[in-house]
Amino acid sequence: GYTWADSAPVVSLLETLEALTEYQRAGKIRYIGVSNETAFGVMRYLHLADKHDLPRIVTIQNPYSLVNRSYEVALAEVSQFEGVELLAYSCLAFGTLTGKYLNGAKPAGARNTLFSRFTRYSGEQTQKAVAAYVDIAKRHNLDPAQMALAFVRL
């Protein structure tokens, strides 16, 4: 696990937002977004932008898939009401939603074969869910990966 070090340098959210504003005004970036942020963090950025007349963040890049729906807990509400769009990543859950790892399969060259420490999507519950999703896809003549990506596009 991660151990917080009180002596670690911290850059305030306001200072970060001011620096990004300078880049935007200089034409080096068009918009400001965040990645792997919480609903609280997004709302703090938005509050500071409004309070100090700075550009608001417009995107959040977080994981989102059929088997990782944590975005829906609070961030979806922030996105809807504050206009902060999701740029989803890990939409195939490290390739798990393709079905290629079902029944303990370890395809040569596949991410979970090469990097076995990535076990986030290898648990029993996830494997059961993936098997059900793959079954649904096959019954409807869909590619499991296409079905998983279509879910994220909704």
Segments predicted by a language model, with ranges:
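Glycine/proline-rich, positively charged
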Residues: 1-67
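Soluble or luminal CAZymes and related metallo-dependent hydrolases
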Residues: 12-16, 37, 71, 125-129, ...
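Surface-exposed amphipathic alpha-helices with a cationic face
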Residues: 21-24, 46-49, 76-80, 134-138
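Conserved short secondary-structure transition element at the edge of the structured enzyme core
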Residues: 24, 91, 113, 119-154
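Conserved, mostly hydrophobic/aromatic
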Residues: 32, 60, 79, 86-89, ...
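Glycine-rich beta-alpha junction loops
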Residues: 38, 64-68, 90-97, 151
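Hydrophobic packing residues within well-ordered alpha-helices of enzyme cores
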Residues: 42-45, 79, 97, 152
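Aromatic-lined glycan-binding groove of carbohydrate-active enzymes
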Residues: 71-110, 142-143
